[in-house]
């Protein structure tokens, strides 16, 4: 049997091994062809592994690390002090050929910087972008990028994001000729910042991209586009606002606290909402789509939410598997070469 091998930064995130280790075992139980290289402090990880099914432990290898990248470290500082950290070792396992992808819930800036340093960028890509597939009203998925890797983006970067997002939509969501839109404050061509308007003009000239113009944030979940492109500042705020709202709605719809002042009204809402509608709300649970692709790199790197629980981190591991199986980095490189946009 040919295994798919992933390297996991076991020490990253708000909860570290308390979440990443149980999630690793859950992923191994779900995917028989998966092997995991768990990078972290053996003294912390081994006690957590005690009691788990030995059958799954056979497909898990513990790779020791001496330190961890702190969440509050600035990217430059984190990179400078990254030697022997769980994050860097996990990335170097890809470089050495021992792993096919990496998953980390650690410091986003450090992960991007170290990935560029260790994994390298695809020719023709200036900066990697954090990318996620979000469910929408029409029961499909919208690829949205960038979600926070790049606060400022020029028009060239936005065009590159559009190309990468199109490939991801085709390969992961299975959409033929995906629609691409730019996130903006209005649908009129005159709206928005200069970089957005310039990117729009360029996208209109690329026949292989199905560019449909601007989309406003209130249409994100309406299924009006398959790929939504924006800078990391707008994307991160949009995503977190949506996730916060959905967590609030889901918590209200699933509350069982009789003393809650809203309980009576919530119960009435539950009775009014049919099962189909309720299921659509449940599908928007952020835990179900945890794991952002750091696209633009020569290998797959997945960034999990720092506060992810066990099931959410398991989802991030699954996302990494999908990307490896569908050869996303290779497909992006092929698309860039075909479009003659690579840098010489």
From Swiss-Prot:
HAMAP family: PlsX. It is found in: Cytoplasm. Homodimer. Probably interacts with PlsY. Its EC number is 2.3.1.274. InterPro entries: FA_synthesis, Phospholipid_synth_PlsX-like. One of its GO terms (cellular component) is cytoplasm. One of its GO terms (biological process) is phospholipid biosynthetic process. The gene is plsX. It comes from the Bacteria. This is Phosphate acyltransferase. Keywords: Cytoplasm, Lipid biosynthesis, Lipid metabolism, Phospholipid biosynthesis, Phospholipid metabolism, Transferase. It comes from Blochmanniella floridana. One of its GO terms (molecular function) is phosphate:acyl-[acyl carrier protein] acyltransferase activity. It holds the Pfam family FA_synthesis. Belongs to the PlsX family.
